[in-house]
Each structure stands twice: as C-alpha cells, then as structure tokens.
C-alpha cells in the first residue's frame, strides 16, 4: 500500500514484506515478484507499508492514500475482486478497475459472453461444475482445451489440457472439479499465444505484442511455465493485424473502461490469419522480465516509469472517490 509520510509506525497488523521471514510455498516466483514491486514503489519515493490484512487500511486513521494490491491468491472464493470491492466500501483509491469490471475479467466464461456481445472473435466455450455435471455429448466440435474458469497464473493447465475427444475432456475436467474448481472447456485454437498489454488513459495505449515462450505441445502456456517462467517472453510482429487488434481494444475500452492497465490474451494462427481472444487480465504482472515491461522498454520506458504512470492515472481515475465517508462506522 502506498501511504502518506509517517504512517509506518502505527498501521495495524503490518506484515514483513520479506517473504523469507514468512515463506509462501507453491507460488513459484510470485513472492519474489511481490517483494520486488514493494521495493520498486518505495524507490519511487512513496511511503509504503506491506500488509496481508485488508482491514489494516481501516485502522490507518485516514493516513493511507492508495492501495496497490497484489493480493489475488488467497483462501476464499473469487479473491481477485475482494480488494477492489473492499476499497469501494471504505472509499479509498485502489489499483485496477471497479469490482464489477474485475468480476467480468476474472470469470473467463463471463468474459467470453461479454466479448461475444461486442462482436469480438472468441472460441466456443462451456462452463462445467460439480453441480451441473459434464454433458454426455460434446456441445461443439473439437479439439478442446480444458482449464479453470477462475484463477490466475494458468492454474491447472497441463499438457493434457489439449483434448482430442470429449472422452478426454471428461477425464481432464473431472480432475479439476475433484480439486474443487469450476471448469471452462473451449474449442482449442491453433497458433500461438500473443498478449497485448494496454495502459489506461484518455484513450487506451497499446504497448506492443508479446509472445510467452513455450516448449509444450501446441505452444500452450502451462501452470509450471507461468509460475517459474524459465523461458520468458519475446516481442512478436502481428503482421497486418495491428489495426484489427486496436479496434478490439477500443471496443473493450468503450464497454469496460476506464481501467488502470490490462492485457488482452489472444491465440493467433499466423498461417490462416485467424485471431481469437482467450481472456482479459487486470492487475497483471508488472515484473521487469514480464510482458508489460518488455513491451514498454521498446518505447524507452522502464518499470519505474510504468509504476509512476499507472499509480498517477489510477489516482486520477478515482479522484471523485471520497475517502472514509462519514457514514462509515
């Protein structure tokens, strides 16, 4: 959290940002990334306090100006939208987008429905859960791709997420449902993943086109690749699709903006020229080695420049959000 000068001495339930003192297992490189962002915001000149307790802000006696949330992987259903909802309740500016927009982005099936209503090209898909069960017959032609309906970091995606038959879908989907997850089954898209990072502004700013590297079948991005990121990213040319992608981004911004920053993840088959949107990510990775910083560097901007811009734009976006309304207890 970025806060006013002198707030560090009394903020309730502060946690040491050094994860070596309080280790978090099973999260790959994310704890280190979170710590690096904490330090980067400090280095800009903000007074920053780290806390894993959202209610710390309420005990800060009005001395917190902004919540820069990295908290989207914790033990509750739909954790990604909690912080934005909570900050709206206590009326303090926060990173990302309003909670209703976060909810659209975090529910990959809902994203698909909204994008289809905007006449954007998305693959066919169906949501599955333990309550609904798995249809006996395939609702659309294969091959198929099976993943979690909710969640970040390509959670649950493995090489066998590509399914050539509905029988294989049944097996893969049951594995995820037995782990307690809702499932999204999509029509598998040939090609490669291309992510398009976008900054908020008076008009959305497309930073570039980035391919997450993959050594998996179909060049898919699996959970282990996302968590450990040993292959990294590379800039790619989208050939003659730039104007079409810009049109996609404008449609999304017109319907869902303003947002502080986001990514649109495509699957592009350069042989056929077909592009399909898989999902949208808000409050996504801002690490120096990630897609957003890589794209920004092509324009001469550093991670520090990005953080300064995003925080400043976010504060401006929420300039009418009253802090600590008098009706709050």
Across the structure, where does each feature detected by a protein language model lie?
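Active-site nucleotide/adenylate-binding loops and adjacent lid/helix of ATP-dependent enzymes
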Residues: 1-6, 102-184, 191, 243-246
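ATP-binding N-terminal substructure of ATP-dependent carboxylate-amine bond-forming enzymes
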Residues: 1-94, 100, 129-136, 318-321
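Short beta-strand segments
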Residues: 11-13, 147, 186
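Anion (oxyanion) recognition and catalysis
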Residues: 42, 88, 116, 177, ...
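Hydrophobic beta-strand scaffold residues
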Residues: 48, 93-94, 122, 144, ...
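Conserved metal-phosphate-binding beta-hairpin within the catalytic cores
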Residues: 87, 187, 197-198, 253-288, ...
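Phosphate-binding site of ATP-dependent enzymes
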Residues: 164-247, 270, 274-276
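Active-site "cap" helix and flanking loop/linker of ATP-utilizing ligase/carboxylase catalytic domains
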Residues: 211-262, 294-329
């Amino acid at each position: 959290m970025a806060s006013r000068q002198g707030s560090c001495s009394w903020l309730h339930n502060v946690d040491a940002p050094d994860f070596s003192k309080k280790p978090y297992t099973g999260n790959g490189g994310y704890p280190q990334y979170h710590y690096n962002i904490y330090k980067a915001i400090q280095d800009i000149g903000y007074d920053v306090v780290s806390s894993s307790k959202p209610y710390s802000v309420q005990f800060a006696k009005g001395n917190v100006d902004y919540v820069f949330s990295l908290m989207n992987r914790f033990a509750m259903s739909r954790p990604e939208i909690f912080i934005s909802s909570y900050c709206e309740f206590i009326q303090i500016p926060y990173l990302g987008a309003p909670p209703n927009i976060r909810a659209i982005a975090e529910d990959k099936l809902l994203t698909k429905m909204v994008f289809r209503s905007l006449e954007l090209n998305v693959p066919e898909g169906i949501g599955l859960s333990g309550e609904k069960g798995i249809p006996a017959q395939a609702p659309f032609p294969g091959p198929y791709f099976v993943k979690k309906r909710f969640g970040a970091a390509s959670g649950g995606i493995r090489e066998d997420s590509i399914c050539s038959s509905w029988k294989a879908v049944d097996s893969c989907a049951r594995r995820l449902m037995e782990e307690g997850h809702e499932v999204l089954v999509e029509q598998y898209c040939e090609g490669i993943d291309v992510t398009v990072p976008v900054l908020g502004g008076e008009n959305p700013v497309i930073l570039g086109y980035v391919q997450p590297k993959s050594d998996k079948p179909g060049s898919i991005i699996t959970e282990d690749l996302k968590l450990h990121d040993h292959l990294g990213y590379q800039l790619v040319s989208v050939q003659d699709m730039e104007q079409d992608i810009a049109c996609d981004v404008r449609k999304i911004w017109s319907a869902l903006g303003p947002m502080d920053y986001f990514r649109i993840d495509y699957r592009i088959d350069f042989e056929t020229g077909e592009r399909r949107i898989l999902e949208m990510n808000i409050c996504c990775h801002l690490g120096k080695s990630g897609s957003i910083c890589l794209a920004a560097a092509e324009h001469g901007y550093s991670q520090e420049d990005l953080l300064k811009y995003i925080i400043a734009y976010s504060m401006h976006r929420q300039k009418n959000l009253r802090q600590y309304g008098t009706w709050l207890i």
